[in-house]
Amino acid sequence: MNDEFKNIIESLIFASDEELSVKQISDILGSFNKPISATEIENIIDKLNFGYKANGNAFRIIKVAGGYQFATRKEYAFFVG
């Protein structure tokens, strides 16, 4: 996995107020001359989630309404309302 792409995708999803679709992520990266396929984006998101789970993070990236966003894992959702 390309760490630069991983960090960019993670940052985009984290900073977004709304879910981001694979196309939106691809378009943003493409506008910076960093083309990436939909499959690569989805693989990176899967690997990010694997790392979050392995590290015991309280959050993950979920697919919602055709896009991706950060969410608190259900066992911690009670604490954040």
Language-model regions: role of each:
Residues 1, 9-12, 71-81:
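Phospho-regulated, low-complexity intrinsically disordered regions of nuclear gene-regulatory
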Residues 30-41:
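Short, positively charged loop/turn segments that connect secondary-structure elements
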Residues 5, 43-77:
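Charged low-complexity interaction tracts in eukaryotic proteins
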Residues 12-15, 32, 51:
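Conserved, well-folded catalytic cores of nucleic-acid-processing
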Residues 24-28:
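A short acidic, leucine-rich amphipathic alpha-helix
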Residues 2-19, 45:
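Positively charged, polyanion-binding regions of nucleic-acid-associated proteins
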